[in-house]
Amino acid sequence: MNIIDQVKQTLVEEIAASINKAGLADEIPDIKIEVPKDTKNGDYATNIAMVLTKIAKRNPREIAQAIVDNLDTEKAHVKQIDIAGPGFINFYLDNQYLTAIIPEAIEKGDQFGHVNESKGQNVLLEYVSANPTGDLHIGHARNAAVGDALANILTAAGYNVTREYYINDAGNQITNLARSIETRFFEALGDNSYSMPEDGYNGKDIIEIGKDLAEKHPEIKDYSEEARLKEFRKLGVEYEMAKLKNDLAEFNTHFDNWFSETSLYEKGEILEVLAKMKELGYTYEADGATWLRTTDFKDDKDRVLIKNDGTYTYFLPDIAYHFDKVKRGNDILIDLFGADHHGYINRLKASLETFGVDSNRLEIQIMQMVRLMENGKEVKMSKRTGNAITLREIMDEVGVDAARYFLTMRSPDSHFDFDMELAKEQSQDNPVYYAQYAHARICSILKQAKEQGIEVAAANDFTTITNEKAIELLKKVADFEPTIESAAEHRSAHRITNYIQDLASHFHKFYNAEKVLTDDIEKTKAHVAMIEAVRITLKNALAMVGVSAPESM
């Protein structure tokens, strides 16, 4: 339990003891304490006096006074109590309790903020999963940044997380990729008789793949058409995935599993789920096609599994894939999908219900669109290539840190304008610069302290920390673990980015309000330990969203 929860629990226990001591109730109702909207009204407040009115048969202000008179303020860490309005009790805490967070942060280091106890739940988080047919773009970048941050947050909150990328390597788009490579392969060999397919891929990368294969494997030209296309499918996916993996690694995004759609066919899992759904009575034949009764489970219409020409829809392997996720022992399935996948939510949930799996175990987040902005105007095409701007170009333009930070600043269900000019600014107007500068500034102060012979120590007299800005800063440090818990519970990576901004802001305010290194050696030691706790917290929070914490800027 974190220090904030401990203090709240202690306060509730002491209020209950006070009610008991005052003889106000035999059975004490649920005591709720809240943080007042206005900090002038204390650190916490409760309406318990009004709740007790009918039980105690007394005026609520009178009840409130009885609670105050019988409260052990020392145990409750309370220095002042006010009774307001009809009977609200406002508590002002003795904030020395907050200094306990300093040695805790120093001792835990890079584990500070992490929950000690395992949730005992396995989470499979699938994100990015872009088709291996071209470069990653801004939508994929947002998916990668949010997905990786969410995986870090859930891990810190005590979940067992598996990060997975689903490789769509079995559909028509891969056939088109193979045909496109075939055209470029023969062109490189001087044979222009192979035309590009109607839905082919015309990127420079396909030309390069064709040239490379013509140089390294010219013997492919002698294969039968079937064998040649099979080889181009395999090699095309390998080339594209190698490129995607490289870009994602550079974007500080990593996966535990790369799950191939083709493996579902090879292992017979497609036929397995088809037979199972048929056996359970959820499929039927109509218009020469095979349908799934998803309307039985709140979908707006039934869905086709096998088209009247005998080919599978995309939905069928998706069902097999999600059933495979469940079979692997995952308790929670989280999918991060692009904005064009909104219609998939109900049908995927319905498909799980056909197997008797609670569809609430599947959580789908839709990533809304991102617009790249420069000088107030949307930038749709690369000046260099004339094509859509790639993740690699974004990394080259603004850097990994800025891209990761900006893309996790907003809730994924909201549209976002990515200001590339702001992301490059070395000023405190740039959110990521502002946050990283706070860390670098602390490192600079710690270096000065060390030069003066003052080392960071967890054991110090912290009673000298009385400045209001210092107390507010410590409250923010103490709020790190609850913020991680909240971000994990709501699957909201942007809560961590917002926290980082607040923590950096509180540090800068403290720095501007009070000198860290003073003539008072004890006070200086306490300050040095405190800002080290802030530095650890900042570094851990930045790492959670995949951003570095530089020691100098």
From Swiss-Prot:
Keywords, alphabetical: Aminoacyl-tRNA synthetase, ATP-binding, Cytoplasm, Ligase, Nucleotide-binding, Protein biosynthesis
One term under GO cellular component: cytoplasm
GO biological process: arginyl-tRNA aminoacylation
Keyword Nucleotide-binding: yes
A GO molecular-function annotation: ATP binding
Motif 'HIGH' region per record, residues: 130-140
Source organism superkingdom: Bacteria
Principal location: cytoplasm
Pfam family, one: Arg_tRNA_synt_N
Key word DNA damage present: no
Subcellular location field: Cytoplasm
InterPro entries: aa-tRNA-synth_I_CS, Arg-tRNA-ligase, Arg-tRNA-synth_N, Arg-tRNA-synth_N_sf, ArgRS_core, DALR_anticod-bd, Rossmann-like_a/b/a_fold, tRNAsynth_Ia_anticodon-bd
EC number: 6.1.1.19
Coiled-coil residue windows: none
Catalyzed reactions per annotation: tRNA(Arg) + L-arginine + ATP = L-arginyl-tRNA(Arg) + AMP + diphosphate
Family: Belongs to the class-I aminoacyl-tRNA synthetase family.
Listed NCBIfam families: argS (TIGR00456)
Subunit composition and interactions: Monomer.
Protein's recorded name: Arginine--tRNA ligase
Species of the source: Staphylococcus aureus (strain MRSA252)
